[in-house]
Design a protein with these regions (language model features):
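Glycine-rich, highly charged phosphate/nucleotide-binding loops
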Residues: 48-65, 164-172
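Short, glycine-/small-residue-rich phosphate/pyrophosphate-handling segment
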Residues: 15-16, 107-145, 221-231
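Short, acidic/small-residue loops that bind anionic groups at enzyme active sites
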Residues: 88-109, 201-223
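Glycine/small-residue-rich loop that forms an oxyanion/phosphate-binding "nest" at active or ligand-binding sites
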Residues: 60-105, 109
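Short beta-strand segments enriched in small/hydrophobic residues
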Residues: 1-19, 113-116
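Active-site rim beta-loop-alpha module in soluble metabolic enzymes
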Residues: 124, 131-189, 197
Length: 231
Protein backbone atom coordinates (compact mmCIF):
# COMPACT_ATOMS: atom_id res chain seq x y z
CA UNK A 1 0.00 0.00 0.00
CA UNK A 2 1.34 3.42 -0.97
CA UNK A 3 -0.04 6.53 0.73
CA UNK A 4 0.64 10.11 -0.36
CA UNK A 5 0.71 12.55 2.56
CA UNK A 6 0.31 16.22 1.66
CA UNK A 7 1.84 18.57 4.21
CA UNK A 8 1.44 22.33 3.99
CA UNK A 9 4.97 22.87 5.34
CA UNK A 10 7.97 23.58 3.11
CA UNK A 11 10.73 21.00 3.61
CA UNK A 12 13.39 23.62 2.95
CA UNK A 13 12.00 25.82 5.74
CA UNK A 14 11.33 23.14 8.38
CA UNK A 15 13.39 20.11 7.38
CA UNK A 16 13.52 18.60 10.93
CA UNK A 17 9.73 18.47 11.10
CA UNK A 18 9.33 16.92 7.67
CA UNK A 19 11.99 14.31 8.42
CA UNK A 20 10.42 13.47 11.78
CA UNK A 21 6.94 13.27 10.25
CA UNK A 22 8.07 10.90 7.50
CA UNK A 23 9.94 8.73 9.99
CA UNK A 24 7.00 8.62 12.39
CA UNK A 25 4.37 7.80 9.78
CA UNK A 26 6.42 5.05 8.20
CA UNK A 27 7.23 3.58 11.62
CA UNK A 28 3.58 3.31 12.65
CA UNK A 29 2.33 2.24 9.21
CA UNK A 30 1.03 -1.30 8.79
CA UNK A 31 3.47 -3.86 7.34
CA UNK A 32 3.73 -3.34 3.59
CA UNK A 33 2.57 0.27 3.76
CA UNK A 34 4.83 3.14 2.73
CA UNK A 35 4.05 6.82 3.23
CA UNK A 36 5.47 9.54 1.00
CA UNK A 37 5.39 12.96 2.65
CA UNK A 38 5.41 15.98 0.37
CA UNK A 39 5.43 19.64 1.35
CA UNK A 40 4.30 22.81 -0.37
CA UNK A 41 6.48 25.67 -1.52
CA UNK A 42 5.92 28.40 -0.60
CA UNK A 43 4.28 26.97 2.52
CA UNK A 44 1.16 28.06 4.41
CA UNK A 45 3.15 30.76 6.21
CA UNK A 46 0.85 33.78 6.26
CA UNK A 47 -2.08 32.18 8.05
CA UNK A 48 -5.47 33.03 6.57
CA UNK A 49 -8.10 31.99 4.07
CA UNK A 50 -6.24 33.14 0.98
CA UNK A 51 -3.16 31.10 1.90
CA UNK A 52 -5.39 28.08 2.56
CA UNK A 53 -6.93 28.45 -0.90
CA UNK A 54 -3.56 28.79 -2.60
CA UNK A 55 -2.18 25.72 -0.88
CA UNK A 56 -5.38 23.78 -1.58
CA UNK A 57 -4.95 24.34 -5.32
CA UNK A 58 -1.41 22.96 -5.13
CA UNK A 59 -2.62 20.02 -3.06
CA UNK A 60 -5.28 19.19 -5.65
CA UNK A 61 -2.67 19.20 -8.42
CA UNK A 62 -0.47 16.93 -6.31
CA UNK A 63 -3.38 14.61 -5.59
CA UNK A 64 -4.11 14.16 -9.28
CA UNK A 65 -0.43 13.41 -9.91
CA UNK A 66 -0.34 10.98 -6.97
CA UNK A 67 -3.23 8.94 -8.32
CA UNK A 68 -1.65 8.88 -11.77
CA UNK A 69 1.57 7.64 -10.14
CA UNK A 70 -0.19 4.67 -8.56
CA UNK A 71 -0.70 5.77 -4.96
CA UNK A 72 -3.51 3.94 -3.14
CA UNK A 73 -4.68 6.87 -0.99
CA UNK A 74 -4.18 10.59 -0.49
CA UNK A 75 -4.04 12.22 2.94
CA UNK A 76 -4.63 15.93 3.34
CA UNK A 77 -2.06 16.26 6.12
CA UNK A 78 -3.28 19.71 7.13
CA UNK A 79 -5.98 19.81 9.80
CA UNK A 80 -8.00 22.57 8.12
CA UNK A 81 -8.70 20.22 5.15
CA UNK A 82 -8.90 22.92 2.43
CA UNK A 83 -9.83 21.43 -0.92
CA UNK A 84 -10.89 18.12 0.65
CA UNK A 85 -14.24 17.83 -1.10
CA UNK A 86 -12.81 19.06 -4.39
CA UNK A 87 -10.15 16.34 -4.23
CA UNK A 88 -12.73 13.67 -3.46
CA UNK A 89 -14.76 14.77 -6.46
CA UNK A 90 -11.66 14.44 -8.63
CA UNK A 91 -9.92 11.24 -7.49
CA UNK A 92 -11.03 7.62 -7.42
CA UNK A 93 -8.61 6.63 -4.65
CA UNK A 94 -9.58 7.32 -1.02
CA UNK A 95 -8.96 10.91 0.12
CA UNK A 96 -8.65 11.40 3.88
CA UNK A 97 -8.80 14.77 5.60
CA UNK A 98 -6.80 14.90 8.81
CA UNK A 99 -9.29 17.28 10.40
CA UNK A 100 -12.38 15.33 9.40
CA UNK A 101 -10.94 11.94 10.39
CA UNK A 102 -9.73 13.23 13.75
CA UNK A 103 -12.94 15.03 14.67
CA UNK A 104 -14.99 11.95 13.83
CA UNK A 105 -12.65 9.67 15.78
CA UNK A 106 -12.63 12.01 18.78
CA UNK A 107 -16.42 12.10 18.80
CA UNK A 108 -16.35 8.37 19.59
CA UNK A 109 -14.23 9.01 22.69
CA UNK A 110 -16.30 11.75 24.28
CA UNK A 111 -19.20 14.12 23.87
CA UNK A 112 -17.50 17.50 24.21
CA UNK A 113 -14.44 18.31 22.09
CA UNK A 114 -11.80 20.96 22.76
CA UNK A 115 -9.38 21.98 20.00
CA UNK A 116 -5.89 23.47 20.36
CA UNK A 117 -4.86 25.03 17.06
CA UNK A 118 -1.61 26.67 15.96
CA UNK A 119 -2.86 30.22 15.79
CA UNK A 120 -5.99 32.09 16.90
CA UNK A 121 -6.67 33.00 13.24
CA UNK A 122 -7.85 29.41 12.72
CA UNK A 123 -10.39 29.39 15.55
CA UNK A 124 -13.36 30.43 13.40
CA UNK A 125 -12.21 28.09 10.63
CA UNK A 126 -12.37 25.10 13.01
CA UNK A 127 -15.85 26.03 14.22
CA UNK A 128 -16.96 26.15 10.57
CA UNK A 129 -15.16 22.89 9.93
CA UNK A 130 -16.96 21.14 12.78
CA UNK A 131 -20.30 22.43 11.48
CA UNK A 132 -19.46 21.13 8.01
CA UNK A 133 -18.79 17.66 9.40
CA UNK A 134 -21.98 17.63 11.47
CA UNK A 135 -20.16 18.08 14.78
CA UNK A 136 -20.73 21.76 15.48
CA UNK A 137 -22.60 21.15 18.71
CA UNK A 138 -19.83 18.87 19.98
CA UNK A 139 -17.07 21.51 20.05
CA UNK A 140 -16.78 23.24 23.43
CA UNK A 141 -14.10 25.72 22.46
CA UNK A 142 -11.10 26.31 20.19
CA UNK A 143 -7.94 28.03 21.38
CA UNK A 144 -4.73 29.01 19.60
CA UNK A 145 -1.15 28.33 20.65
CA UNK A 146 0.09 31.42 18.84
CA UNK A 147 2.84 29.41 17.13
CA UNK A 148 4.30 29.15 13.65
CA UNK A 149 5.72 25.96 12.10
CA UNK A 150 9.31 27.08 12.63
CA UNK A 151 8.66 27.36 16.38
CA UNK A 152 8.63 23.55 16.49
CA UNK A 153 11.95 23.15 14.65
CA UNK A 154 14.17 22.71 17.71
CA UNK A 155 11.84 20.14 19.27
CA UNK A 156 11.78 18.07 16.10
CA UNK A 157 15.55 18.42 15.69
CA UNK A 158 16.03 16.55 18.97
CA UNK A 159 16.21 19.37 21.53
CA UNK A 160 14.60 17.71 24.56
CA UNK A 161 14.25 20.97 26.48
CA UNK A 162 12.46 22.58 23.53
CA UNK A 163 10.20 19.54 23.23
CA UNK A 164 9.33 19.73 26.92
CA UNK A 165 8.56 23.47 26.63
CA UNK A 166 6.25 22.90 23.66
CA UNK A 167 4.41 20.12 25.49
CA UNK A 168 4.05 22.40 28.51
CA UNK A 169 2.66 25.20 26.32
CA UNK A 170 0.21 22.78 24.70
CA UNK A 171 -1.05 21.50 28.05
CA UNK A 172 -1.40 25.05 29.36
CA UNK A 173 -3.63 25.91 26.39
CA UNK A 174 -5.62 22.69 26.71
CA UNK A 175 -6.36 22.86 30.44
CA UNK A 176 -8.94 25.70 30.18
CA UNK A 177 -10.77 23.66 27.54
CA UNK A 178 -11.16 20.78 29.97
CA UNK A 179 -12.21 23.20 32.70
CA UNK A 180 -14.93 24.43 30.32
CA UNK A 181 -16.24 20.90 29.89
CA UNK A 182 -14.20 19.25 27.14
CA UNK A 183 -13.77 15.52 27.68
CA UNK A 184 -11.52 15.04 24.62
CA UNK A 185 -8.63 17.31 23.55
CA UNK A 186 -7.62 17.55 19.89
CA UNK A 187 -4.36 19.06 18.62
CA UNK A 188 -5.86 20.81 15.57
CA UNK A 189 -2.71 20.55 13.48
CA UNK A 190 -0.25 17.86 12.49
CA UNK A 191 2.61 19.88 14.00
CA UNK A 192 1.24 19.66 17.57
CA UNK A 193 -0.15 16.21 16.76
CA UNK A 194 3.31 14.92 15.94
CA UNK A 195 4.71 16.70 18.98
CA UNK A 196 2.52 14.64 21.31
CA UNK A 197 3.01 11.48 19.24
CA UNK A 198 5.50 9.91 21.62
CA UNK A 199 3.54 10.95 24.74
CA UNK A 200 1.72 7.66 25.14
CA UNK A 201 -1.52 7.92 27.10
CA UNK A 202 -1.35 11.71 27.32
CA UNK A 203 -4.31 13.28 29.10
CA UNK A 204 -5.29 16.73 30.26
CA UNK A 205 -7.00 16.01 33.54
CA UNK A 206 -9.42 13.24 32.61
CA UNK A 207 -9.51 14.13 28.89
CA UNK A 208 -7.49 12.02 26.42
CA UNK A 209 -5.44 13.84 23.78
CA UNK A 210 -6.04 12.51 20.26
CA UNK A 211 -3.04 12.10 17.96
CA UNK A 212 -4.31 13.48 14.66
CA UNK A 213 -1.31 12.24 12.65
CA UNK A 214 -1.89 8.64 13.70
CA UNK A 215 -5.65 8.89 13.19
CA UNK A 216 -5.26 10.24 9.64
CA UNK A 217 -2.79 7.56 8.60
CA UNK A 218 -4.80 4.69 10.07
CA UNK A 219 -7.97 6.07 8.47
CA UNK A 220 -6.25 6.04 5.09
CA UNK A 221 -5.12 2.45 5.58
CA UNK A 222 -8.65 1.46 6.58
CA UNK A 223 -10.24 3.07 3.52
CA UNK A 224 -7.75 1.42 1.18
CA UNK A 225 -8.57 -1.95 2.71
CA UNK A 226 -12.31 -1.31 2.53
CA UNK A 227 -11.97 -0.32 -1.11
CA UNK A 228 -10.12 -3.57 -1.77
CA UNK A 229 -12.91 -5.50 -0.04
CA UNK A 230 -15.93 -3.66 -1.39
CA UNK A 231 -14.76 -1.94 -4.55
Amino acid sequence: MRIFWQSFVDASVNAPYMARLSEYLNNIAAPGTTVQVEGISPPDREFGRLAELRCAVQAIDNGIAAEESGFDAFVMGHFQDPGLYELRSTLDIPVVGTGEATLLAASQLGRRLGLVTLDPVFEVWHYEQAERYGLGDRVVHVTGLGCKPEDFAAAFAGDQAAHARMIEDFLACALPLVERGADVVIPAGVLPGLLIGRERGLKVGHAPVVNCAAVALKSAEMWVQLRQLNG
